A protein has these predicted regions:
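Hydrophobic, aromatic-enriched alpha-helical segments typical of multi-pass transmembrane helices
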Residues: 2-255
């Protein structure tokens, strides 16, 4: 028998070493996903809260109506400068956090590379673009008021009030909720009711956007749907947090 045969026989006779990862390593394997779930749920709760503050505070501060004279707008913007700047921040930040929540849902569902994921991503980009433009117009009002520029004050204020409510349901909102709804279908990321209601919200936004073209009632419906959207995001975020906590509890019991 040659030396190579002896070596191979010894190798075959030796037991096979099985490397088992320590429990700590196994426990940390799902940490990135759990962390993403927690951060996503947090963003999904804080975002709608900021948007609720953005929509509520102006009503309590006697916000000017459409058609207010430039002189009155300048006086109001000068006295409530922080309200305009804070409103722009609340709107942009609240929308950004809501979009972060949508992106987390897409990541968890594994649908980013699908058609539904692409539709949702495009809708998120459109939504953030519209929001940032409106926030910029809103913050331009006190800046122009400080310079005594009546034309810019009147134009910026008019564009930042009511225009967003008409544009939002035309494309951004339906694309976001249609994409998210179909992306969540057949997954266990959230309970099935959220996928179904997301598609329903998409349809209602389309109806509101079309109705707003012909009557004020459509604009009112679009505003109501914006509230429904915020409620859906907050409820979905809470559901995500609960499923994350439940999964972590089961993982702890298995260890």
């Amino acid at each position: 028998m040659s030396r190579s045969d002896t070596g191979s026989q010894g190798a075959d006779a030796s037991p096979v070493a099985v490397i088992t990862p320590p429990p700590a390593q196994t426990a940390h394997a799902g940490q990135p996903e759990r962390r993403m779930r927690v951060l996503g749920a947090l963003a999904g709760v804080v975002g709608p809260v900021l948007l609720a503050v953005y929509f509520t505070v102006p009503a309590l501060a006697h916000w000017p109506y459409a058609g207010t004279s430039p002189d009155k707008l300048i006086a109001y913007a000068t006295a409530h400068r922080l309200l305009f700047y804070g409103g722009g921040w609340l709107q942009a930040t609240g929308s950004l956090l809501s979009i972060v929540f949508f992106l987390v849902l897409l990541q968890l569902s594994g649908a980013r590379s699908t058609l539904a994921g692409s539709v949702a991503l495009t809708g998120c980009a459109l939504l953030l673009s519209v929001v940032v433009i409106e926030a910029a117009l809103l913050e331009a009002v006190p800046i122009a008021a400080a310079n005594g520029d009546q034309a810019t004050v009147a134009t910026a204020f008019a564009l930042s009030n009511g225009v967003f409510a008409r544009i939002f349901p035309l494309a951004p909102a339906p694309m976001v909720f249609a994409g998210i709804g179909f992306a969540l279908s057949g997954t266990g990321v959230l309970p099935r009711v959220f996928a179904r209601t997301a598609v329903l919200i998409c349809g209602l936004f389309l109806i509101a956007g079309l109705a707003a073209v012909f009557a004020t009632a459509g604009l009112i419906l679009a505003i109501v749907m914006s509230v429904v959207e915020a409620v859906w995001i907050a409820a979905a975020a809470i559901a995500l947090a609960r499923t994350t906590a439940h999964t972590r509890h089961l993982g702890g019991e298995s260890r």
